[in-house]
Amino acid sequence: MSTSKTIVFGLFVATLLVSCNVAANATTQPLFPAILIFGDSTVDTGNNNYHSQTIFKAKHLPYGVDLPGHEANGRYSNGKVISDVIASKLNIKELVPPFLQPNISHQDIVTGVSFASAGAGYDDRSSLSSKAIPVSQQPSMFKNYIARLKGIVGDKKAMEIINNALVVISAGPNDFILNFYDIPTRRLEYPTIHGYQEFILKRLDGFVRELYSLGCRNIVVGGLPPMGCLPIQMTAKMRNILRFCVEQENKDSVLYNQKLVKKLPEIQASLPGSNFLYANVYDPLMDMIQNPSKYGFKETKKGCCGTGYLETTFMCNPLTKTCPNHSDHLFWDSIHPSEAAYNYIGNFVDAQIRGWIKA
């Protein structure tokens, strides 16, 4: 090969390598600088492990059995929870650490954490028995986080990260299950589901406004799942050996979600520079329930842990048997989805977020 041809070939290879490198960087570039998580057990990645007052902890097997190292670290699933899945799909990080975790790294502070607490809800009453950290108290942790972030990157950069971070909120089922359906203490004050839904939406409104005042701008709010299809609710309302979804509770979920869809644009219009997205988790879950074979599920009416009818938190423990194939169950315990289900839900929410960014 002549010298001139060698030079041309070398330039071609160099250009190709640079192009491939740019393309790779483009695909792995995080869509947000950080992810900040608030809510309940669906997004609690271990805060309750370090919250001594609560009885709701998932720091024992079989929780976490399919995580690297087979380590139970506070996630209410056999593996990742939805907050991890979303963070991974958006190229932010593989696992979202809990804020209360001791010795959390500077890098994890900078790229985001979870403030969620299993057992929490928008209604503080939801945490009375479990002593979980209510959603209303999670901004206190967030304020401590902001102070730590400023100490790492400085005031200006910290606020830039928070302004551009993706905020994900997942809460609500505990409020209705613990206060209205199974333990109807709130029915004395709110006789109809409509009244209690309005109360919860008002609490949500105040919560997101507080986050906005602290610098959050990109806020994703999860709707309710089909609550009547949670195994524990099917058990609570079971009248014979056959198990069916509780249709009224599903209808209530749909009604609440419709109200939330209407509410979020109203909040956004009143908060300059804010961007709100309703995350639809109802439809993907219902599709999995109605068309299980499409997703590789063989069981959708009970969890993988124990009988699958009641077991959750301390009732799902190292002495409890689990199903042989974890990925063919929609639910891991009587309330929480399996990692396989969270992955499918995550795909759906990821598509929503990407469409939202482009809009």
Swiss-Prot record:
It is found in: Secreted. Keywords: Glycoprotein, Hydrolase, Lipid degradation, Lipid metabolism, Secreted, Signal. The keyword Acyltransferase does not apply. Residues 1-28 form the signal peptide. Its EC number is 3.1.1.-. Gene3D superfamilies: SGNH hydrolase. Glycans are attached at N103, N325. InterPro entries: GDSL (IPR001087), GDSL_lipolytic_enzyme (IPR050592), SGNH_hydro_sf (IPR036514), SGNH_plant_lipase-like (IPR035669). GO terms for cellular component: extracellular region. The active site is at S41, D333, H336. The keyword Transmembrane does not apply. Its main location: secreted. GO terms for biological process: lipid catabolic process. Pfam families: Lipase_GDSL. One of its GO terms (molecular function) is hydrolase activity, acting on ester bonds. PANTHER family: GDSL ESTERASE/LIPASE EXL3, GENOME ASSEMBLY, CHROMOSOME: A04. Belongs to the 'GDSL' lipolytic enzyme family. This is GDSL esterase/lipase At2g30310. It comes from Arabidopsis thaliana. The lineage of its organism: Eukaryota, Viridiplantae, Streptophyta, Embryophyta, Tracheophyta.
